[in-house]
């Protein structure tokens, strides 16, 4: 790891009452003395100082805080300067810090140093960015839980159980004279099944966290004049799409973002799906299919007065889209019939015009994507889900090796790989490429 000293503005761009400049590294204290006219600083105490340019001209006045390593966020000596929130003043403080020996920090470099100095693990580092970017109260609370180590503790406990199982299996293989018959005594099978069960439980909780963090891409599809634009307007609570009786009014992709019980919902309204000779409409339909293939969930809107629309288009969607994308059929315009709003697992009857049945639709969406708020929930990322899925696949393979082939060495290797995969979640075993990708997504100053 580099041992140079870094500096960055830690507050958002723009003007404000207070702006913070953060410095971290072996020369942080010396740079602070250059800025404050050699006024001594006590660790963990705020000191009021005048702040100077190199020619002893006063730049500003503010508070300077000194955190002596390793008792700091990064584990290094850290200085935080609380000056007035003028972009000009803060830029001058950065320039003076660089002149005194610091360099400008890369995005996320403060958090990266905290990770490399074992102040936080990789889950906690990601949680810092997630807390900053949280789109709802619940997402912020869940990010804080991850930052406080809730998710990490679950992974570490799982790893401890896996380490114990690995030791038992490998000891039996390496020391056959001890006559440990792990292939037949049932202990390994029970321990392995328990670990798989715990992993599935954590995976389910992590999936809820991914929904809260990343949200859900919900694509509205249907024939022209089925009421798609009216539905997106009602879901959004405002007029975001033009609604007319003319078929083919919507020709391009329309996007709107709302919160559905704290889940960020990225709603995409598409052109009506039909054969058309109009070049502009054909391009809109082409883009609609592209969005459908990327969706997390599809709402197929059907005019209840023309139910035959549903069969052909539903079959076309089923044949074209990946099996993992759920399709909810929405029978619209019940206000023109004697029907009332109702729903079942993948079907909703509603009126986009009056709003009747919208609550039922929201309920079905949450059920279809598997959102179930639970105690102990935490924020997670897709890479965490991928690692958990990979670890489970390895454990299931190992279980098969044990049950069907009595292959102890192959079981031991699958357990080792599963352990390594889980350690990638917390960063115990992580490639430099992954670290670079994660920390580069942070804002500068974190």
Swiss-Prot record:
List cofactor names only. K(+)
UniProt binding sites for K(+): 225, 244, 246, 249
Q: Chief location of this protein?
A: cytoplasm
Residues that, per the record, bind (6S)-5-formyl-5,6,7,8-tetrahydrofolate: 22, 80, 119, 446
What enzyme category does the UniProt record give? hydrolase
Where on this chain does Mg(2+) bind? Answer: 229, 250
The family this protein is said to belong to: Belongs to the TRAFAC class TrmE-Era-EngA-EngB-Septin-like GTPase superfamily. TrmE GTPase family.
Q: Any idea what this protein is called?
A: tRNA modification GTPase MnmE
Give the gene that encodes this protein: mnmE
């Amino acid at each position: 790891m580099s041992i140079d000293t870094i500096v960055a503005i830690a507050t958002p761009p723009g003007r404000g009452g207070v702006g913070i400049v953060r410095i971290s590294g072996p020369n942080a204290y010396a740079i602070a003395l250059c800025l404050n006219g050699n006024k001594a600083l006590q660790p963990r105490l705020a000191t009021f100082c005048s702040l100077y340019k190199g020619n002893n001209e006063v730049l500003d006045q503010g508070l300077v805080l000194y955190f002596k390593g390793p008792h700091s966020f990064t584990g290094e000596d850290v200085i935080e300067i609380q000056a007035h929130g003028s972009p000009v003043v803060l830029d001058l403080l950065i320039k003076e810090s660089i002149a005194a020996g610091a360099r400008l920090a890369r995005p996320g470099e403060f958090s990266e140093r905290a990770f490399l100095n074992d102040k936080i693990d990789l889950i906690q580092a990601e949680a810092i960015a997630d807390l900053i970017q949280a789109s709802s109260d619940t997402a912020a609370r869940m990010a804080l839980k991850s930052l406080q180590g809730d998710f990490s503790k679950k992974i570490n406990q799982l790893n401890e159980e896996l380490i114990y199982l690995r030791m038992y299996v490998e000891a039996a293989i390496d020391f056959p004279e001890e006559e440990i018959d792990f292939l037949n005594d049932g202990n390994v099978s029970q321990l392995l099944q328990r670990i798989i069960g715990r992993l599935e439980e954590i995976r389910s909780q992590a999936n809820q966290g991914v929904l809260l963090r990343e949200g859900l891409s919900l694509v509205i599809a249907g024939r022209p004049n089925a009421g798609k634009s009216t539905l997106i307007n009602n879901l959004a609570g405002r007029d975001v799409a033009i609604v007319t009786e003319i078929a083919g009014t919507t020709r391009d992709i329309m996007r709107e973002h709302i919160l559905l019980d704290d889940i960020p919902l990225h709603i995409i309204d598409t052109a009506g799906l039909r054969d058309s000779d109009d070049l502009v409409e054909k391009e809109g339909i082409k883009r609609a299919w592209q969005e459908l293939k990327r969706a997390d969930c599809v709402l197929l809107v059907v005019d209840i007065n023309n139910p035959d629309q549903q069969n052909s288009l539903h079959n076309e969607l089923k044949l074209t889209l990946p099996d993992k994308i759920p399709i909810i059929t929405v029978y619209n315009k019940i206000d023109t019939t004697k029907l009332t709003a109702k729903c079942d697992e993948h079907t909703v009857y509603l009126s986009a015009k009056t709003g009747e049945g919208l609550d039922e639709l929201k309920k079905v969406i949450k059920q279809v994507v598997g959102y179930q708020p639970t105690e102990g929930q935490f924020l997670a990322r897709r890479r965490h889900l991928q690692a958990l899925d990979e670890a489970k696949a390895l454990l299931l393979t190992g279980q098969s090796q044990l049950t069907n082939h009595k292959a102890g060495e192959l079981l031991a290797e699958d357990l080792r790989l599963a352990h390594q995969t889980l350690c990638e979640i917390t960063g115990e075993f992580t490639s430099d490429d992954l670290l670079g990708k994660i920390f580069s997504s942070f804002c500068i100053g974190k």
